[in-house]
Amino acid sequence: MDIQNVPKVGISSVVHSKHIDADSIDVIDNDIALFDSESVISLYSGPSKLEVLTIGLCLEGEGTFNINLQDFQLSSGGMVIALPSQIIEHRQFSPDFKGIFFAVSKSLLETLPKVGNLLALFFYLKDYPCFSLTPNEQRTVQEYHTFIRKRLRSKGDLYRREVVLGLMQGFFFELCNIFNNHAPAVTSSVRSEE
């Protein structure tokens, strides 16, 4: 696969696509987008290079896809996190597939407070982007998605952007809590073995 010819996917390319109803995706500038599976599942038929951090939670059904040429399967209660610059390709989704998604620009990621050992977490996610969440963790992700989306739709609010950014910061702290429950601890002995 010639990486030069792989289409890049960012927030603006999805919002401005003629295949997508722009009213089904809630955004702030080119920094944050929240959407559901019905919004973008069939947008691209081939591989795409991500320009954003994408977080997805499968609510129903299942899907198969690959990230950087590695195959993965996602089923109900499963979360996937695809990092900027990774190449993702949708393979197949069951007819009953439903999911919720967050997309965050690289520039916004750089402004978020640094949480714990985030670099080690990103290295872990490059190899293990999918994991199953507990019912409580699923509810937490869904609650953030619902509330942030509600705030995104309050277009007349004076501090809409600031409120959404604050909620996203809280969401990233919650994600770090979830990762701590699922990712193996990174210790100095592990690093010395590499």
Each language-model region and where it sits:
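Generic protein-terminus/edge-of-domain signal
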Residues: M1-N66, Q70-F72
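A hydrophobic/aromatic-rich effector-binding and dimerization subdomain
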Residues: D2-K8, V14-I25, R91-R153, N181
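Amphipathic, well-ordered alpha-helical segments in soluble domains
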Residues: T54-L57, T140-F147, L167, F171-E174
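Short acidic-glycine-tyrosine-enriched beta hairpin
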Residues: L69-I81
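Well-ordered beta-strand positions in beta-sheet-rich domains
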Residues: D71-Q73, I87, C130
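Short, Lys/Arg-enriched, Trp-marked, Pro/Gly-tolerant hinge/linker segments that flank
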Residues: S132, K155-V163, L175-E193
